[in-house]
């Protein structure tokens, strides 16, 4: 039944007027149970019909297990926004650590050279060197051990990828 509903939604999206329709949001929980092989084209094409597709899964390994690793990578690339909560498997954490990007940092090294005071002209020289280092923004361990209700989020705004950052869930009080 879930696949039928998803195929019906896909059909409805493709009937929309490209680039001029209002935005529509499709949310699919536990989506590995409902997807089908051509789903990868749907997530790419849905953008021009202004359909936003949000999916949730326990692990991306479900995709690789069912359809293969390349299919999984194709889907992950097609989904432009990514949100990862803690307590994921180390395998998923490694994958998302790479997907969420890298950052450059610079390490300073200092050296000193001293000419013995017993020489005619004792001298002390010091210098600094800088080395560029590229590292993942969030290591697998930082992804796994995030604070409760904290998520690593990477989004695209106006076709520009925004670097990953960690956000805290802001729940609506029960009184509301």
Report the location of each language-model feature:
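Conserved P-loop NTPase motor module
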Residues: 108-176
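Conserved P-loop NTPase motor cores
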Residues: 1-127, 166-173
